[in-house]
């Protein structure tokens, strides 16, 4: 996993939609820390801090030490970010408090590597991504920023399943009962046409003359 990030915030006194709107009018993003069998902590964050962290890999699976001005520091993960429907700006952030026994469920992005080492792609095959993310459950400190799928040697018609993905100890796929598909190498349209024509020719040759 990546290094633990740091965030700073100010506390706020009031909850509710009216208080959240007032926080936004002040140019801040309302937020809350909850979980860990403790009372929620109401916060306001500078928008630039959220934007900076969202541009980094593994934002949704990363641990943060969030320090409240004049208060304590909380170990947290981002649980949810709400966005404005028009501007797409963050308008509220939920943080989950992380304890020593906390486990979380998150979707981790999949990165594909060594595409140039795939004979199927070199022949014009198409990488058909079935899952852009893998939903996993586990300890926050064991979560990777992303999973890698190596396409070395992949031929047209091959399917790559979750069983070949390197998953850290302490992390497990939410779908555990089957080896689900991550991607396939599909035949290019030209090759499909050639194979179809060849199949039709073979069928015609095998048909007895009337």
Curated annotation (Swiss-Prot):
Keywords, alphabetical: Ribonucleoprotein, Ribosomal protein, RNA-binding, rRNA-binding
Query: Membrane-spanning regions, if any?
Result: none
Stored Pfam families: Ribosomal_L25p, Ribosomal_TL5_C
What is one cellular component GO term in this UniProt entry? cytosolic large ribosomal subunit
Annotated segments matching region Disordered: 1-23
In Gene Ontology terms, what is one molecular function of this protein? 5S rRNA binding
Q: Which CDD domains match?
A: Ribosomal_L25_TL5_CTC
Q: Show the InterPro entries listed in the entry.
A: Rbsml_bL25/Gln-tRNA_synth_N, Ribosomal_bL25/Gln-tRNA_synth, Ribosomal_bL25_b-dom, Ribosomal_bL25_C, Ribosomal_bL25_long, Ribosomal_L25_dom, Ribosomal_uL5_bac-type
Any one Gene Ontology biological process term? translation
- PANTHER family named among the record's database cross-references: RIBOSOMAL PROTEIN L25/GLN-TRNA SYNTHETASE, ANTI-CODON-BINDING DOMAIN-CONTAINING PROTEIN, RIBOSOMAL PROTEIN L25_GLN-TRNA SYNTHETASE, ANTI-CODON-BINDING DOMAIN-CONTAINING PROTEIN
Per the record, the similarity remark reads: Belongs to the bacterial ribosomal protein bL25 family. CTC subfamily.
Q: What does this protein do?
A: This is one of the proteins that binds to the 5S RNA in the ribosome where it forms part of the central protuberance.
HAMAP family in the record: Ribosomal_bL25_CTC
Q: How does it assemble?
A: Part of the 50S ribosomal subunit; part of the 5S rRNA/L5/L18/L25 subcomplex. Contacts the 5S rRNA. Binds to the 5S rRNA independently of L5 and L18.
User: How is this protein named in the record?
Assistant: Large ribosomal subunit protein bL25
Q: Which organism is it from?
A: Rhodospirillum rubrum (strain ATCC 11170 / ATH 1.1.1 / DSM 467 / LMG 4362 / NCIMB 8255 / S1)
**GN (gene name):** rplY
């Amino acid at each position: 996993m990546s290094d633990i990030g740091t965030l700073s915030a100010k506390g706020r006194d009031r909850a509710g939609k009216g208080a959240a709107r007032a926080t936004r009018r002040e140019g801040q993003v309302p937020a809350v820390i909850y979980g860990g069998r403790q009372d929620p902590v109401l916060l306001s964050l500078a928008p630039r801090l959220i934007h900076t962290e969202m541009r980094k890999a593994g934002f949704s699976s990363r641990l943060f030490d969030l320090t409240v001005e004049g208060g304590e520091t909380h170990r947290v993960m981002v649980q949810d970010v709400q966005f404005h429907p028009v501007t797409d700006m963050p308008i509220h952030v939920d943080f989950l408090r992380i304890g020593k026994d906390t486990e979380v469920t998150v979707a981790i992005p999949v990165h594909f590597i060594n595409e140039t080492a795939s004979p199927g792609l070199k022949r014009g095959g198409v990488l058909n991504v079935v899952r852009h993310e893998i939903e996993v459950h586990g300890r926050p400190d064991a979560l990777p920023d992303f999973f890698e799928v190596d396409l070395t040697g992949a031929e047209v018609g091959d399917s790559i399943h979750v069983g070949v993905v390197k998953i850290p100890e302490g992390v497990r796929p939410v779908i555990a009962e089957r080896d689900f598909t991550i991607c396939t190498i599909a035949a290019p349209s030209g090759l499909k046409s050639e194979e179809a024509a060849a199949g039709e020719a073979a069928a015609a040759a095998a048909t007895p003359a009337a």
